[in-house]
């Protein structure tokens, strides 16, 4: 994004200017937030609405989500939604992440890291996406079927027995595991993060999900 936030459109134009083609990566899977940023730009252009407006109309309003907000919303709205600041471990102690910097990063991660949401709201949204009327069965079959080695598509790592989604940044961790129809789900979020802990927690959550499904 631009050094100082101007608009979503300016950020997308800035990203496009600095996006280059690397032939060595052609045909190889690699996650990058810029794909979601471009998708947000395409949707906004097609619908003539901002990504925020589209998100509110698609999820927040119809699902009556009370604990979901954009990180750049007013502090009043954030606190009303139950928002808590993120902390990162540095030199042996947890330091609060600067909110202004977190907001700038949220703008730069449009569509990939802009939302703060409670476990309950996240579960409700995931159930709506995987089992509700938002998508047709045919659309879900296409969207949630990734290719090896990661099986990533539609925002999930689509494993054989369950789906995986993770998030990290600005002092937050999110780990989500769900069965295909969102009947069984694990959601763990934390606002205290430390270098090297993400991978360890991710493996433990995967293990818990496997055990849960084994006894289900």
Model regions: which residues?
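Loop/turn elements at helix/coil->beta-strand transitions in domains of secreted/extracellular proteins
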Residues: 66-67, 181-184
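A short acidic/small-residue loop/turn micro-motif
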Residues: 106, 192-194
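Hydrophobic residues embedded in beta-strands of well-ordered beta-sheets
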Residues: 163-164, 183-185
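Short clusters of small/polar residues that mark proteolytic maturation junctions
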Residues: 168, 189-190
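Short, surface-exposed beta-strand/loop micro-motifs that present aromatic residues
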Residues: 172-181
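Short, gly/Ser/Thr-rich active-site loops of penicillin-recognizing serine hydrolases
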Residues: 194-216
């Amino acid at each position: 994004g631009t050094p100082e936030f101007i608009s979503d459109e300016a950020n997308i134009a800035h990203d496009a200017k600095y996006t280059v083609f690397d032939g060595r990566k052609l045909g190889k899977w690699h996650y990058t937030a810029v794909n979601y940023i471009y998708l947000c730009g395409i949707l906004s252009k097609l619908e003539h609405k901002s990504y925020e407006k589209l998100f509110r109309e698609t999820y927040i309003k119809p699902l009556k989500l009370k604990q979901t907000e954009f990180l750049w919303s007013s502090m009043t709205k954030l606190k009303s939604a139950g928002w808590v600041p993120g902390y990162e471990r540095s030199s042996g102690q947890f330091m609060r992440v600067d909110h202004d910097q977190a907001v700038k990063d949220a703008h730069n991660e449009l569509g990939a890291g802009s939302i703060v949401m409670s476990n309950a709201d996240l579960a409700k949204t995931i159930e709506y996406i995987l089992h509700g009327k938002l998508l047709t069965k045919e659309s879900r079959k296409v969207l949630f079927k990734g290719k090896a080695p990661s099986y990533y598509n539609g925002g999930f790592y689509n494993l054989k027995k369950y789906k995986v989604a993770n998030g990290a940044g600005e002092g937050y961790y999110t780990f989500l595991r769900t069965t295909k129809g969102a009947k069984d789900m694990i959601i763990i979020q934390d606002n205290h993060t430390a270098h090297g802990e993400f991978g360890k927690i991710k493996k433990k959550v995967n293990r818990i999900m496997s055990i849960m499904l084994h006894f289900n």
